Amino acid sequence: MKKEILLVLLCILTNIVFAQEINQVDVNGKRHGIWKKNFDGTNQVRYQGEFEHGKEVGEFKFYKLLKMKSVLTAVKEFNVNDNSAFVRFLSSRGKVISEGKMVGKFYVGEWKYYHNESDKIMTLEHYDEKGLLQGEKLVYYKDGVIAERANFVDGKLQGESKWYSVKGVVLKAFIYDNNELHGIAKYYNGKSELLAEGHYKRGKKAGLWKYYENGELTREKDFSAPITRKKKQ
């Protein structure tokens, strides 16, 4: 009986000591050591990790409250040499949804997004140091075939974008300028036969558009702005 009482007291003392050792600050008031915070009004953890004189170090875990239970939603591994962190976002089942580098709140460098219930890459993107999309963005079907290819400059669509069928056939080909459709556009069916072609001008169809069936031109439509004539006085 005495041993049981001593064991209970030891557990209580251990918890008290541990509680005193977490959520501490240094002489300058900066967070230092192990920190752990719960969701308000609950005993469910919201985040936990370690600070070194105000700087996050090592692994941090972040949770969401799901049915009043903490569920791990993100893991950040902080770099000791700078403010960057390698981040993995997780589903409620623990599967990695996306992963890449962050500096503060900005995505930086290569980011990978995964298909649901699969470890196959769904989207591959690249960000600059300002968190803006740069260069080629690729979207994949589950079997690894490219579904979409686009190009970005400073976070905006620029140049040619293409969409593909599961068999790798081009279905659409557009030209963008400063995030707007601007230039020639072509639509195809799954047999790679041309369905329609024309031009966009600042996001709107412009000029003569041609439409096809079975490779034959079937109709044309002119999207040119009508000429307004002033009435004679």
Protein language model annotation of sequence segments:
Residues 1-23:
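Bacterial Sec-dependent N-terminal signal peptides
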Residues 18-233:
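Glycine/tyrosine- and acidic-biased, solvent-exposed loop/turn segments at the edges of beta-strands
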